[in-house]
Curated annotation (Swiss-Prot):
Coiled coil feature spans: none
Protein name: Small ribosomal subunit protein eS1
Signal peptide span: none
NCBIfam families the UniProt entry points to: PRK04057.1
UniProt family annotation: Belongs to the eukaryotic ribosomal protein eS1 family.
Keyword Ribosomal protein: yes
Record bears the keyword Ribosomal protein: yes
Cysteine pairings via disulfide bonds: none
GO MF entry, a single one: structural constituent of ribosome
HAMAP family with a match to the protein in the record: Ribosomal_eS1
InterPro entries: Ribosomal_eS1, Ribosomal_eS1_arc
Length: 198
């Protein structure tokens, strides 16, 4: 004989939980990005929330930028986050690929001035097809410039350079002297570890 579902107990469990409004960091305007539920606020720390830069900035042109935030502290019914990475949507990346051109990916690992160990993926799109030596030269310039930028700045400055596109524009200015370049994008960023500075 099948057991009856304990509906009453399940309802009581939900009643024991509370809703918390989740906010992005001050650098992104401290905008609320949704709500999450937990029985204990301590269980929220470390939880990851996702949204788009378009939703945060109320700018449809930035809907292709997916943002990830991790809850770092809770005060009352408010949960505050830190930015832990971004990624461009696959549809957007496909739209950048053109025939008879080259796509050049560079992977950069480095530590920021404030001790964040990060992994960045930078993609370069050329105007015409590049040969292997040209691809190697382009990748070297991008990797060197990005590694220097990361090492000389804190995580907040690196994030600002990524989401505003300023670092992509700086790299484009350097690389287009080597080969005709259409676009450079930091397509993905990710924190690999927590702060490592004592």
């Amino acid at each position: 004989m099948a057991k009856k579902k304990q509906i009453g107990r399940r309802v009581e469990g939900w009643k024991a939980k509370s809703w918390y409004k989740v906010y992005v960091p001050e650098a992104f305007g401290s905008t609320p990005i949704g709500e999450t539920i937990a029985a204990d606020s301590a269980n929220l720390v470390g939880r990851v929330m996702s949204t788009t830069l378009g939703e945060i900035a109320q700018d449809f042109a930035k809907q292709h930028i997916k943002m990830k935030f991790k809850i770092s502290r809770v005060a009352g019914d408010a949960a505050y986050t830190e930015f832990i990475g971004h990624e461009l949507t696959k549809d957007y990346l496909r739209s950048l690929v053109k025939r008879r051109t080259s796509r050049i990916d560079s992977h950069i690992m480095g530590s920021t001035k404030d001790g964040k160990r990060i992994h960045l993926t930078v993609t370069c799109y050329t105007l015409i097809g590049a040969n292997s030596s040209q691809i190697h030269a382009i990748r070297n310039v991008i990797s060197a410039q990005m590694a220097t930028f990361v090492a000389q700045n804190d995580w907040a400055t690196v994030v600002d350079g990524i989401v505003t596109g300023s670092i992509s524009r700086d790299m484009l200015a350097q690389v287009k002297g080597i080969f005709p370049i259409r676009r450079i994008e930091v397509i993905k960023s990710k924190i690999e570890s927590k702060v490592i500075i004592a």
